[in-house]
């Protein structure tokens, strides 16, 4: 494959075109009056969304240099989504603003390295100020406000707030598709641990790469399973019942894993194997928790039990098991209620007695998994297209709410970034470093400017008014009013705003210090048609 190299201004200009194409498609969705973007999907209905990272992932440009620029900004959205779960559009708008303003200065002769130092300096001060003005989230109403703003839907905010109230801020909340038109909240008892399936061939839904087991048996052991012969007797008993099985073991590999996968693919039985959670003594304790929750026994040498002698009566039972590549959730464990209560009491006593903060934290985690529940938000809609769009919004809102509980909230609608403008402007710097600071200052205005423009207003006027308004006062684009943003419930999680600014600055600094770009060029003469087999090439 032939490769082409572009240098300096040519390289940056070519990539900027891609940055602008992606960012312009994403930023129209920002704010309460933002628009939707329609994404073409092969073989299925188009997806209508206002989720920044979903749009960014779909964009592929023909020109290789433009595509590289677009992918750089898509990385900002991806990274922000990974860290905070929301704020991807804001991050994209910030990155575009920094790159555009920075490129103007680099073209005029400024040193990119000096500019980078200025950007880093200004962002460090901005992050300190965001932390200083951040407000802790505690009440149910505040949690609902965060969810409502993220999803642009008060009902969704209420669902998330209720779910977190019922299972705790750190509880497990999942989002599923409803069979009806209404969105509903359902809370079910359950336990989750951070271990996924041993092989992707165990999934029951290859599109989502998940394994859902209905009414499964659960084999719990602290042994390593390498030989298929060790578990063959119990699997033969399982086949007679036509029920699936979840195998929780120290590890499942070798001959055992191969045969489980082969039999799964042949349809002989449905089995999913996962590694046991935790390590050492803590693993044994967590397996005992799981056994009590599901009414099973831990197959362990400590009790003189062998895998070959395992019977169906020793297995745990659950209503449903949900397994992803990273997590396993066991819902409706069918253990004896009195045994579960006794175990909960035992854990509470251990928490009171322990002096180690680390041990206390781990015991509280186990208690939450044993006594806590799983909240399920069942999303309903009239059409499949609306369902997908609504589901994406609820996922963003849930992530946003968790982020708010973790690091607090700041005034929303881009107000927080403008309110720290003067503090960042006070950063002492000279020359190209000062230019880098000014680039960040310009970017701080970009989100509120875009929100205003999406609402049909002049962004510059709104920005200047906020700069001279009282702290916390901002523009509510939904109602066209000037209000105290936090009092009005228009808030953003500090973590989301922080992550968006950090990631945008990181990519912008890398972009501006790029001096050469190497791209693969498409072949001008594709391979000619070789004709049909056994016949000469056709003209």
From Swiss-Prot:
Compartments (UniProt record): Cytoplasm
Record: residues binding ATP: 29-32, 86-90, 413, 476-478, 492
Keywords annotated in UniProt: ATP-binding, Chaperone, Cytoplasm, Isomerase, Nucleotide-binding
Pfam families in UniProt: Cpn60_TCP1 (PF00118)
GO biological process: protein refolding
HAMAP family: CH60 (MF_00600)
Self-association state and partner proteins as the record states: Forms a cylinder of 14 subunits composed of two heptameric rings stacked back-to-back. Interacts with the co-chaperonin GroES.
NCBIfam families: GroEL (TIGR02348), PRK00013.1 (NF000592), PRK12849.1 (NF009487), PRK12850.1 (NF009488), PRK12851.1 (NF009489)
Protein's recorded name: Chaperonin GroEL
Gene field: groEL
